[in-house]
Amino acid sequence: MINEDSIQLDTLLKKYYEHSIEKIVFADDNGKIIAMNDAAKDILSEEDNYSAVANAICHRCEGYTNAYDVQSCKDCFLESMQVQATNFQVFMKTKDQKVMPFTATYQLIDQDRGIHAFTLQNVSSQIEQQEKLHQQRMMRKTISAQENERKRISRELHDSVIQEMLNVDVQLRLLKYQEDTTKLLEDAENIEYIVAKLIDDIRNMSVELRPASLDDLGLEAAFKSYFKQFEENYGIKIIYTSNIKNTRFDSDIETVVYRVVQEAILNALKYADVNEINVGIRQTGRHLVAEVIDAGNGFDPSSKPKGSGLGLYGMNERAELVSGSVNIETKIGEGTNVTLNIPI
């Protein structure tokens, strides 16, 4: 290791302070700025002080990043007069009125004299690169979700609609050779029944693809309609609780909540072997939470999932599109609890 005395550490630190692109500000215990390097003068003025409401920072600050927002002034640490050592991401306005992202640190460096250091490092290029990577990931996830949805629709069309239409086609062809009037009427009634069932299948598929009530009336109405249809089709009771009433949310959020709940219910139908499923939707502070709970078979999360596994994967994919998360708690023989949490 190089001997610090031989290279005059104080001189190097002074040169770093004077020539660094990092913005460095020193302040006393009262918040009065006592020194700043040239880089800091792009944002702060030597006449500024932040003894009361952190004026030197606040009058240039456009918000800091917290757990809920990229830019927010809510619960800012500078509102407290007892500021401890901290680091955070903040958006500051430069003297040419450009808003730039910075990584900031604030810490006590000389306890005897009460000297604090406030530093800012521009992270614009890092943020831009992260945003590009995030957009690329989201694009891949979106394309993957779309392809999975297309595959599902293709299977539904082939297994139900097309098969029923082929059945009708055969029945109609046979009518040409039917001479018995009574049998002809029976065949016609059978065709009528098949067509009616085909219409129901197409209608149900349309609702599954995108229920009109979701766009027109929101989650509450869409879920009530879907649960009623689900109970009629499968004989499984849905116990639904909610505190959102007719509250509307962002369209993307409503879509994700609807799809994740729908997928969780269908998984319970396929694998849980239950007579009822509990569904809860609630708004808690700045979060929208959806739960689907069954007391069925459960499964081992560490083992290979039944079926294709795309259902569980798709739920996580959808949640990530709106910065949400899906948590699955399950144990063999003790049921499954699927929880979706989305910041709003």
From Swiss-Prot:
This is Oxygen sensor histidine kinase NreB. Residues 152-344 form the Histidine kinase domain. Binds 1 [4Fe-4S] cluster. PROSITE patterns: HIS_KIN (PS50109). It catalyses: ATP + protein L-histidine = ADP + protein N-phospho-L-histidine. One of its GO terms (molecular function) is ATP binding. The lineage of its organism: Bacteria, Bacillati, Bacillota, Bacilli, Bacillales. The modification Phosphohistidine is found at H158. Its cofactor is [4Fe-4S] cluster. It is found in: Cytoplasm. CDD domains: HATPase_UhpB-NarQ-NarX-like. It is an enzyme of class 2 (transferase). InterPro entries: HATPase_C_sf (IPR036890), His_kinase_dom (IPR005467), Sensor_HK_TwoCompSys (IPR050482), Sig_transdc_His_kin-like_C (IPR004358), Sig_transdc_His_kin_sub3_dim/P (IPR011712), Sig_transdc_His_kinase_NreB (IPR017203). One of its GO terms (cellular component) is cytoplasm. Keywords: 4Fe-4S, ATP-binding, Cytoplasm, Iron, Iron-sulfur, Kinase, Metal-binding, Nucleotide-binding, Phosphoprotein, Transferase, Two-component regulatory system. Autophosphorylated. [4Fe-4S] cluster binds at C58, C61, C73, C76. Its EC number is 2.7.13.3. It holds the Pfam family HisKA_3. Member of the two-component regulatory system NreB/NreC involved in the control of dissimilatory nitrate/nitrite reduction in response to oxygen. NreB functions as a direct oxygen sensor histidine kinase which is autophosphorylated, in the absence of oxygen, probably at the conserved histidine residue, and transfers its phosphate group probably to a conserved aspartate residue of NreC. NreB/NreC activates the expression of the nitrate (narGHJI) and nitrite (nir) reductase operons, as well as the putative nitrate transporter gene narT.
